[in-house]
A protein has these predicted regions:
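Conserved N-terminal phosphate-binding loop of PLP-dependent enzymes in the Aspartate aminotransferase
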Residues: 1-180
Length: 180
């Protein structure tokens, strides 16, 4: 799988039982990674790292995956959910940029962004593909801020869009890919 995906040397694969479990593992990885970011360690008074998800995104019904799922009707019954997961308008580069810009150590600043999770073709609210410019901007912002880019390919991976993974059509390489 690593070779087929064109992943860098040293990449790893985690096998689970479902898409939700794959997304759960990706979010756990992001939480662990976030603790290593400057200013994010709670042990030394840092602010918890954040995970950015998209409006209209669906990542599963387990607690972590549900926390990154946007639809209030699905989420509300199970609150409180995993903290420090925020939503930005899917496709809005300025909103994504603003989410990264909110990082700061001041009284109103937030912790650093550990990861951005997105589906390249959202299916919960219809078939809504994200634009290539948006996806490339997300990759660039993640690189600039040392955040992980998580691509949820549960509904789009393994050849469902004409390539092995949908991200291959966008000319980017994510840090984490989940699929079932």
């Amino acid at each position: 799988l690593v070779k087929l995906a064109g992943a860098p040397e040293g990449s790893r694969v985690y096998f689970g039982n479902s898409g939700a479990e794959g997304n759960e593992a990706a979010l756990k990885l992001a939480k662990l990674y976030g603790r290593t970011l400057p200013g994010a360690s709670p042990e030394i008074g840092g602010k918890p790292a954040r995970i950015i998800s998209m409006t209209h995104g669906f990542h599963g019904r387990t607690m972590g995956a549900l926390s990154a799922t946007w639809k209030p009707a699905i989420r509300e019954k199970f609150e409180p959910l995993v903290p420090n997961i925020e939503f930005v308008e899917a496709g809005n580069v300025e909103a994504l940029h603003d989410a990264f810009a909110e990082t700061g150590q001041g009284k109103y600043g937030k912790g650093p962004v550990a990861a951005v999770i997105m589906e390249l073709i959202q299916g919960e609210a219809g078939v809504m593909p994200l634009g290539a410019d948006y996806v490339k901007a997300a990759r660039k912002l993640c690189d600039e801020h040392k955040a992980l880019l998580i691509i949820d390919e549960v509904q789009t991976g393994i050849g469902r869009t004409g390539t092995l993974f949908a991200y291959q059509q966008y000319g980017i390489l994510p840090d984490v890919v989940s699929f079932a």
